[in-house]
Structures are given as structure tokens and as C-alpha cells.
Amino acid sequence: MARDATKLEATVAKLKKHWAESAPRDMRAAFSADPGRFGRYSLCLDDLLFDWSKCRVNDETMALLKELAVAADVEGRRAAMFAGEHINNTEDRAVLHVALRDTSSKEVLVDGHNVLPDVKHVLDRMAAFADGIRSGALKGATGRKITDIVNIGIGGSDLGPVMATLALAPYHDGPRAHFVSNIDGAHIADTLSPLDPASTLIIVASKTFTTIETMTNAQTARKWVADTLGEAAVGAHFAAVSTALDKVAAFGIPEDRVFGFWDWVGGRYSVWSAIGLPVMIAVGPDNFRKFLAGAHAMDVHFRDAPLEKNLPVMLGLIGYWHRAICGYGSRAIIPYDQRLSRLPAYLQQLDMESNGKSVTLDGKPVSGPTGPVVWGEPGTNGQHAFFQLLHQGTDTIPLEFIVAAKGHEPTLDHQHEMLMANCLAQSEALMKGRTLDEARAQLQAKNLPASQVERIAPHRVFSGNRPSLTLIHDMLDPYALGRLIALYEHRVFVEAQIFGINAFDQWGVELGKELATELLPVVSGKEGASGRDASTQGLVAHLHARRKA
């Protein structure tokens, strides 16, 4: 069926009425009255548990949300994506990052062409190159083994590899991995300064080989290599992830060190492609394939499971409920796993660049809010930074906890138990809160004077009823990481279909790029600032004055 705008509008109205009149108000009471609440509002896929029972929903909420998914034709749009249809309508492209991890022998067609052999060919080339670097068969220009990899990229060419490489640290048995993204010269200077060009491989990740930040940093790195080892050494110390073979050749990188990908892979969905080359070099091709396999398992589940048993669908529906119906403008991603410390930033790009839109697929203004602000930090660090606001602030911010049942350090299992206890405690505290009477009783138990009890007790009250959901898996290994990322990718897709927007373009980044190009000669003093707004003129003048001071 097609998207039913009339039914969709009616269901949204019913959801808003339900939120105002009959959604759970007291979560303590909801759990007390319903011992089966956890069982009804949780799902498992193998060892991965998704619990949303602490969110303010009931059976009526879930029935209406499923009705919403049907009206938005989530299933039809999902089928269109997997079939290679051009669902990215503003760029007239297919959206097939799922093909990058499809290990089946079936066809995946884009405009009548089966892309799976192409995917396999690139993956095999990546594996051969990674094995060569890791084993020392592929050496630097002076014959030394490569000990360090520097990936130069930005956005999707950086955030995914950074996040995955850090997450899979226990599996590193290859060269050390470093990442440069910012145009700020401090980033590349600090990264290269402790390294030796003779044992360093630099990967330049830019599909067009024109991205200004990436290519500026790449030229700096090229000079670093050439000045030390000579111009002829450049080819042995660089590789590229790009489709612009002419530009790569002009840079001095041999074609056998160039790895391509396709326009049906968006940057923020590209860690599964050749963009993941630094990850593969760090952890090895076998572990990288396990990473792909985990994502593929989630793809199959998302494609085949019925709506009410489908983890990405339910995660997306809860996300929509919080954003569009409850009016929560933000969501916090809190992984209780230090190695997932870059996951919030990765999901921030995935979600906000995808669903931060204000027009529908047909170019009309949206009728309600779209994607939320996504942010976060790992636990327990966040508890000592911003959790105060999450518990007692005036804004309600849903939290999404992620924790593993087992850590990688058996001799530190007691610390992992403390980590898990903190995660569950925060989830429970947000839901239960603490009443004024409970605060008084706690203070009275300390034998404080009555006047002091009355003065302090209001400050120790927690409203509770603050929603959170929890994801638990066995252990953060390559398979689990791939599955987790794919879960969030498909969640973003589900929310976008209900919002009625295109999750796969990013026109919002263009205007700033254009103006930066215009302003570069102004900032450098080659052109004047006349014709620009008064604020920009004033800022330029101040910068010029301070640079001369």
C-alpha cells in the first residue's frame, strides 16, 4: 500500500489525544499494577535485548503506533529500499548500504545491475591490501614495515571508522590507527608529530577527492612524507578511498591502492564500504567480515520480522512517540562502555544529518517536528557531568542506555559489575524518582533537626517518570557492533518514513560550504568584506586586527 496521508494525520491526532488523556502518568504505579509489563514491552534478537518498558506507553500507545507505521507504509518503503528503488528522490539514487554486508548469493539490483559481485570484488581487494600491510609484505619506501595508519577524512569518512576502531580495540592486532578530520592544522600536526613517515601509511578518504578539509590535510601529509623520504616515496605511503581515479593519480597514488564505492552509499552509511579500510587493517579482514555479518543479521531481521516483533521498527516508533507526540526535543545516547565513547557522535551524525529536515519528500513544509537533537557520553562519566539535569532539570530528555553483559577484561569483572549496576540504577532512578515524603524519611533517618529536614528535603526530590530504554548484548565484539549500528540505521529510516522526509540527502551542509569558499579570500586579506552583513564585516575586521597584533 502507499502512504495514506489522511489515515496518518488521523492517527497522529489520536496519539496526541491519547498522550494528553490516557498515557501512563505514574510509572511506579504502572509497574506495580502490571507484573508483565517488561515482557510485553521488550524484544530480543538472539542475545540482543531491547527494553522500552520504562517509557510512558501502554497497550493503546503501541496499537496506535503500529497503526501509524502502517499508514506511513513503512513496510512498503522498506521493501523499496531493499529492492534498490531510488528512494533518495532529491538525488535520484538508490539507498543500498545493506548490500555492502549482504553475504547471500542473491541478486541486489540497482538499475538492473547486480551490485553484489562489485561489492565482493572491492571487499576482496581491501582484504588483500590489509593482509599485505598487516603482515609486512607491503612495506614503506625504505623497506620498513608499516606500524601506523593515518586516516584522513571528515564526516562519514571519519566518524564511522573512528567509532568502530575504538569500539573494537580488544581485536587490534594490526598497525596503530590514527584519524585526522578537522581543517584546523593542529589536528594533523598533533597526529603526525610523534609518527615516522617511513613506517606510516596514510589513507585519504574522499569520494570526489575534492573535499576541502580532507584534501587540505592530505596535501599537508603528502608534504610531510615527500620532505622526509622524497617525492618518489609518496605512492608507497598512501592509499585512497575514492572514485576520482584521475585526481588520485595526479596526487601520486597508484591505482592498485585506490578503493572505490558507489553513489548508492551515503557517507554516514559508508563504514561498511572501503571507508572501513582502516578498521579492517586494525582488526583484520576476518573480524571485519564478522562486523558485516552482524549488520546483515539485523538487515534480515528488519526486512522480514513483523512490525510488532521488529527491533528497528519498535525503536523507531518509540523515537517518534518521544519526539513528535511527547514533544521531547532531544535524546541522549548513553553507552555504558568506554569503548563506545564515540558512538554518540556517530549516531548524532547518522540521525541529525538524516532526519534534520523541514520539508517532506514532495518539497512541502512538514506539519510537525522531525529529528531530535542527539547527543551523549559514556557512562559512568555522564553521571558526573549532565545527569543532574536529566534527573531534576525542567526538560524531559529520553535516555537510551547500551550495556554488555560481559566485558573483555576477566580480571576486572568486579568493575564491569559496578558498570552494569550503575546503568540499571540510572534507568530505575529516572523512572521511580523520589517523593518528598521519601526524601524527608531519608533525612530523618540521619537524625537531622526537623527544620533542616524541611529545608533540605525539597532539593532531594526527583520527579521520576522520565523515560529511558535499554539495549543489552552479551559482549561488544565485531558482530555485536555491526548489529547495533544497523539497528540504529534502520531506526532512523523508520522515523523518516513516518515524518515523511528524505533521510538520505544532506542539503543543509551546502550553504555553509559555499559561504566558506567565498570568505576564504576575505579572511586571508585578499578581498574586502564590503557587501557582507555588518556582523560578518565586524568579525573579519577584528580577526585581521588580532592577527596583526
UniProtKB/Swiss-Prot annotation:
Query: Listed GO molecular functions?
Result: carbohydrate derivative binding; glucose-6-phosphate isomerase activity; monosaccharide binding
Q: Where is the signal peptide?
A: none
Name a single GO cellular component. Answer: cytosol
Q: What is its EC number?
A: 5.3.1.9
Q: Which UniProt keywords apply?
A: Cytoplasm, Gluconeogenesis, Glycolysis, Isomerase
Catalytic residues, per the record, are E353, H384, K513
Name-wise, this protein is Glucose-6-phosphate isomerase
Record's keyword annotation contains Cytoplasm: yes
What is the similarity comment for this entry?
Belongs to the GPI family.
Entries under InterPro entries matching the protein:
G6P_Isomerase, G6P_Isomerase_C, Phosphoglucose_isomerase_CS, SIS_dom_sf, SIS_PGI_1, SIS_PGI_2
Q: Where in the cell is it found?
A: Cytoplasm
What is its pathway?
Carbohydrate biosynthesis; gluconeogenesis; Carbohydrate degradation; glycolysis; D-glyceraldehyde 3-phosphate and glycerone phosphate from D-glucose: step 2/4
Q: Which NCBIfam families match?
A: PRK00179.1
- Name of the gene this protein is made from: pgi
Which domain of life does the UniProt lineage start with? Bacteria
HAMAP family xref list: G6P_isomerase (MF_00473)
Query: Example GO biological process term?
Result: glucose 6-phosphate metabolic process
Q: What's its catalytic activity?
A: alpha-D-glucose 6-phosphate = beta-D-fructose 6-phosphate
